[in-house]
Structure formats: C-alpha cells, structure tokens
C-alpha cells in the first residue's frame, strides 16, 4: 500500500517546494486546487464539534445556473448566511470556468456578508481562505484557514488551506503536519492530492504517482474531479518524460469531461512532445480562447515560436502582460509567475529582478528562490543567481526546469562543465520538459 503521509520524507528535507501554481497551479487557486468544493455546515455528530463537508462540489460547467439561483435567494433573504456562503463559492467556481477575475470581488462580498449575518460561520471563513489562496495572499489564507480549523476541527479542508499556505510560505514541516492531519480526519481526493504533491516536491515521484492514483480513485468517477486527477497524473508523467502515459491520462480526462481546459493544455504539450506542432497550436489556442489565463496564452506563444511565427508569438506575449494587469487590478498577486515569464523572454531584466525579489519576499519558497535566481541569471548577474538556484534545489526535487535554470546560471558564470552536467540531468529527467529550453539544453550538449 503506498504511504499516505509525507512524514517519512521529512528527515531528508528542511522545507518543501511551492506550487505554482499550480498551478496554475491556477492553482494552485489552491495548489491542489482546481478542487474547490461547496462549503456546507452539517449537523454535528454526538462526539464532535460542528463540521464542514467540503467535497460536495458544484459541477464545473453548471455554476452559471447555480449563481442565478443563489443570487435570487439572497435577494429574497439578504441575511441567509448559508446561501451567501454558497454564492461566494459559486463565484469562485465561475472564476475557474471563465478566467474572469471580476468574479473574485463578488465572491469576497458575498462571503463577508455571510460572516456579518453569522459571525462565526466556518464555511464562509474557509471560503475567504480559499479566495486568499486564489489571490496568492498566503499569509491571509493561513490566518483564515486556522480560524476555520478552530471553528470546525473535524472537517478536513481547513487543514488543506492551512497546509497550502504554509507550503507557499516555505514552512514545509508544518505544512506536512497539516496534510497528515487532513488525511487522518478525512481521506479524500483533496488530501491524497496534497500527499502526492508533498512526495513530488521531496523527489519521490513514484510515491507521488501512487498517491495521485488514490486521489483518482477517490474522485469516484465524478467528471470534473476525475478529469482533474487524470491531468495531474499526465503532468507527473510528462515530468518523467513518459509521453505515452501522459497521453493516456489526457485522453481519459477528455473522455469523461470533453473540452476540459486543463486537459487541453496537457494535450497541447503531448502533441508538441510528439512533434505535432500544428495540432499543439490548435489545441493550445482552444484552451486560451475558452479560459484566457496567462498559463494557456503563454503556452500558445511558446508553440508559435516553435513554429517559426515570431510575430504571432509576440502578440500572445503582449496578451499575457495585459491579462496580468487585469488580474492584479482584481486583487491577484501574480509577481512570481510574471517574473518567471519575463525572465524567460528577457523582458526588461532589471525590472524583472525587482519583481522577482518582491515575489520571493511574498512567497519564500523554493520556487520563490528559483524565480529570483532565474531572473538574476537572465539579467547576467550570474554570481548572485547561483546561491538562490542552489536553495531552490535543497529539497531533492526532481524537476528538469530547476536543473536547467541551475545549469544556465553555471554557464553564465563561466563554468561550462557544470552547465553541461545540469543540462544532462534535466534532459535525463524529462527530455520534453520545455518547448523553449529543452532544445537549448540539447544544443549545448551536442
């Protein structure tokens, strides 16, 4: 039976990597997120405090109707805390569906109204914690998650929100402990996914895949959670260079949830890895059109570059910058993701270094370390870059992009032998790790 907690890995590590989220991680939203659930108070068992059941999610794609229904309900009764809390979470799901950040202020208003109506409402508190994760306000998410945990100690999700925030803040042993407790309180897709991420960050990729398969089982065939788990398994497979395995998971995701944008993103990556650039561009464009988030538009730009269409690629890069501005105007902190993107394309290097420093201060994780080191290296400040990129590798994470960044800094500093060693390591981990940088590594080793 695969291990269910990351505790046994802690002896090797002092801290753990951040998602990005995911994520894009989106996730990120929450790092393991894309798993936002409907928060609903339940009757307390005889021996327990009131608890929250957070796994009964509104079906993705069906929330427009739910939003209209809930908006009507709160117009009839403006102090219905339960309906206000559900509305706040439905707005978050609409953000996931559409990429429209204007739903996030609406979510905040609904959840705060719920708390005014019922000041100790755990569901609304945790909804605000989820919102803080989406906005990358990790210190705020930590405080709200802890408050929700105090109010509903027998619910699993508050432990997840607290753990997600702690990971982004670089407090990994504490984050692991929260994930352990979450799994003990309520084994679920959400808890197994966090265990998978913890194992991935500590270099246990086989264990990560095993835990994500448990998450897939826990999804129970429900379309969106099942598709999401398949997408995460596809990402793990691509990170190991297993293109055929990734393709199988993408097909499974799209079979159960046709048009799922996260699966379309991975389908484009699979097509590119197989040399099918035309198909990859078409699929990436479909994802970027459906949900215009930076990760999808940036992928399309990279694919267009690979196709030899620099003008079209530049247009997509400009679109990413515009989307970042809209996200920031709606309260999302995208400094880290923006810094990595700008460093990739050498956009105003000195300004990018300042952005990366600010991002790392907000998110003192190893991905924060990597973003700052990469920005410094791309700005030609190689000696400054190397210590940060070493810190980014301190957990033993098997990540080709981290290896490539370290090699680039070594080459920039004049140590071509070390550069080649790091590039070789990146390609051995996954020869398809990046459409932009894998060819650079191969050329340097030729």
Predicted features, each with a name:
Residues 4-117, 123, 143, 431-432, ...:
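N-terminal leader/linker segments that initiate helical-solenoid repeat arrays
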Residues 63, 97, 104, 138, ...:
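TPR-repeat structural position
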Residues 78, 119, 153, 186-187, ...:
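Short coil turns that delineate tetratricopeptide repeat
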Residues 82, 89, 123, 157, ...:
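Start-of-helix register in tetratricopeptide repeats
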Residues 86, 127, 161, 194-195, ...:
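Canonical tetratricopeptide repeat
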Residues 89, 93-96, 130, 164, ...:
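Residue-level recognition of tetratricopeptide repeat
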Residues 93, 100, 134, 168-169, ...:
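Register position in tetratricopeptide repeats
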């Amino acid at each position: 039976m695969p291990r269910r907690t990351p505790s046994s890995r802690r002896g090797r590590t002092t801290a753990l990597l951040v998602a990005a989220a995911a994520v894009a991680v989106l996730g990120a939203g929450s790092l393991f997120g894309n798993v936002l659930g409907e928060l609903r108070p339940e009757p307390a068992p005889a021996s327990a405090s009131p608890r929250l059941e957070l796994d009964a999610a509104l079906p993705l794609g069906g929330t427009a109707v739910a939003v209209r229904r809930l908006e009507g309900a709160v117009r009839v009764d403006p102090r219905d805390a339960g309906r206000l809390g559900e509305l706040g979470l439905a707005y978050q799901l609409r953000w996931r569906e559409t990429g429209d950040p204007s739903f996030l202020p609406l979510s905040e208003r609904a959840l705060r109204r719920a708390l005014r109506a019922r000041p100790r409402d755990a569901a609304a508190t945790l909804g605000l914690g989820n919102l803080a994760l989406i906005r990358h306000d990790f210190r705020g998410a930590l405080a709200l998650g802890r408050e929700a945990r105090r109010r509903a100690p027998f619910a699993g999700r508050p432990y997840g929100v607290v753990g997600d925030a702690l990971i982004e803040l670089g407090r990994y042993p504490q984050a692991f402990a929260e994930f352990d407790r979450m799994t003990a309180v309520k084994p679920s897709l959400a808890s197994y996914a966090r265990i998978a991420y913890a194992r991935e960050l500590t270099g246990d990729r086989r264990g990560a895949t095993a835990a994500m398969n448990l998450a897939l089982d826990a999804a129970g065939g429900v379309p969106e959670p099942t598709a999401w788990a398949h997408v995460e398994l596809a990402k793990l497979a691509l990170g190991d260079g297993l293109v055929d395995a990734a393709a199988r998971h993408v097909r499974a995701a799209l079979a159960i949830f046709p048009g799922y944008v996260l699966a379309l993103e991975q389908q484009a990556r699979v097509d590119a890895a197989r040399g099918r650039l035309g198909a990859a561009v078409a699929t990436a464009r479909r994802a970027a059109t459906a949900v215009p988030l930076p990760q999808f538009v940036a992928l399309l730009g990279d694919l267009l570059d690979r196709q030899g269409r620099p003008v079209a690629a530049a247009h997509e890069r400009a679109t990413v910058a515009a989307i970042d501005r809209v996200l920031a105007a709606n309260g999302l902190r995208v400094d880290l993701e923006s810094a990595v993107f700008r460093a990739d394309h050498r956009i105003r290097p000195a300004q990018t270094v300042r952005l990366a420093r600010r991002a790392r201060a907000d998110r003192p994780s190893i991905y924060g370390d990597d973003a700052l080191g990469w920005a410094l290296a791309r700005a030609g400040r190689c000696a400054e870059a190397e210590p940060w990129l070493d810190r980014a590798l301190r957990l033993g994470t098997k990540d080709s992009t981290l290896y490539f960044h370290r090699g680039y800094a070594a080459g920039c500093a004049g140590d071509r032998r070390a550069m080649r060693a790091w590039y070789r390591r990146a390609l051995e981990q996954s020869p398809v790790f990046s459409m932009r940088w894998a060819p650079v590594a191969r050329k340097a080793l030729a």
